[in-house]
């Protein structure tokens, strides 16, 4: 529950910032990223596009902020964390969809009226992406919203975008990777040749070997004693690494904590 409360608070703040930023539609003489003649902004068709843009921006931001409440009802598991992460990043991206629509619609209106395209519009794609090989700046002021955006033609701009893309991709892929680890069975197998030993596996990966002649005692626990992770992974169905266990001290584990536990000495 605490995780969901923190995520909902962060989501509400970030979506609110998105909304307040994207409300600023007139930047450097360009309306929603498109430069129009001086009196064109007052035309009914232009005002209709602007009003539709602002209306859909409000609707999407409200739905994204309110949608997080529904995630409180998901069971407390790795799945809920994954859904929250994907929903969070999706909610930050969705408010930009009205920007793409409004920019393209205004461009078509400009072309239909025969208004010339301003030279400053050429480097901008959909009013959001800036690509100007002759501009040495790594970042420039946004045309829709507040803040700056990277120059995708500059080396520093490309590096900044690449770092952000890699970081976001790593975050989005962490959940599925942990999900695979959590649902891959951990097991012990008895190996009799060439030596008699117990081998611990997680899926097809062998984690450690216990020679049979080194086992002096076997104890069965109906449930796993209270333990704290020192290093490693502690998922819902998979623990691997070093743990401190009540009455047993430091132990090395590779097991399903929900299964019956056999402690070997």
Q: Can you say where each PLM-predicted feature lies in the sequence?
A:
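Acidic, Ser/Thr-rich low-complexity segments on the non-lumenal side of membrane proteins
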Residues: 48-60, 134-135, 140-141, 208-220
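Internal/C-terminal transmembrane anchor helices
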Residues: 156-178
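Extended interaction regions within the primary functional domain
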Residues: 70-74, 80, 127-128, 141-142, ...
